[in-house]
């Protein structure tokens, strides 16, 4: 989808979120403006310099910084990284694995129990209508990010699974 196609979509109550794995600040800024993105998800190993500049030009409240808890030896190390990034992001997304996303791999949610995050955070990683309530109860995130758990095949969302997700979360 081009930025222009994204901008033409009527977002209604939904937020437009662009997911970026690049460290190219100009590309991210131009795409965010052209697509009229509400949020910018930094889903790569963007530098602190990149995140700081984007927070100044686009607004820290619009940035979602992705971190992979499995990269850290313990909760304290994850919290330390979150604290370093807190000034340049409005929210964190904690994903399973060591990088990337959409693998269907589940995050060890019990590992996040007691997390003292400096900003709101979302949980991602292998969430499905069948496991979301239990997973959320284990670590109490501010929200969830469904991806591959709602697909009938890679890259194709299943409407029935999408309809089942919210009621499953609410229990």
Q: How would you label these PLM feature ranges?
A:
Residues 15, 25-27, 39-42, 134-139, ...:
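Long, hydrophilic "mature protein body" segments
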Residues 33, 59, 137-140, 170:
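Residue-level signal for alpha-helix termini/capping positions
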Residues 123-138, 151:
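A C-terminal functional module that forms or caps the active site or interfaces directly
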Residues 8-123, 131:
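Conserved anion-binding
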Residues 41-47, 96-102, 139-162:
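Glycine-rich phosphate-binding active-site loops on the catalytic face of alpha/beta enzymes
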Residues 4-10, 52-54, 136, 147-171:
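C-terminal helical cap(s) of enzyme catalytic domains, especially alpha/beta-barrels
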Residues 1:
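N-terminal polybasic phosphate/anion-binding patch
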